[in-house]
Amino acid sequence: MKTLTFKLYSNNNLEIDEKVNYFIKDEVMNFKIDKDTYKYDLKTHNLVKTNHEYTIDINFNKKLVLIALNGYTFEMNIINHSIKNESNNIVIEYTYESEEITNNKIIINY
């Protein structure tokens, strides 16, 4: 099985640094980190994270971060973003405003 490295920086703090197995089906990269399932669409670059408690949908086309929790959906606007996809290396940087401005950077090497 193929492996990828997934890193998430939030406000320059490394929050996730994992090497996990993945597969691609219908141009969607599927992988799990702990109990969380991730789906990254290689065409639209949208990222969805789900577990038994909540879903986070980062939709760059709509410039929204959607969080679904206990039957409620919360929306946070993406202020700006950039996506670089070069030879099995994806770097996504985005900023959104919740209680404060949050800068995230996701790096996927596969």
Predicted regions located by residue number:
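Long, hydrophobic N-terminal alpha-helical segment
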Residues: 1-28
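Short, well-structured hydrophobic secondary-structure segments
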Residues: 18-57
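Mixed-charge, glycine-accented linear interaction segment located at domain edges/termini
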Residues: 89, 95-110
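Short beta-strand segments that buttress and anchor functional surface loops
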Residues: 5-9, 30-34, 48-50, 92-97
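Terminal, non-globular segments
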Residues: 52-58, 64-84
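Structured N-terminal alpha/beta-domain signature
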Residues: 29-31, 67, 100
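A short, compositionally biased
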Residues: 1-2, 42-44, 59-63, 86-91
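Residue-level detection of beta-strand-connecting loop/turn positions
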Residues: 35, 53, 71, 98-100
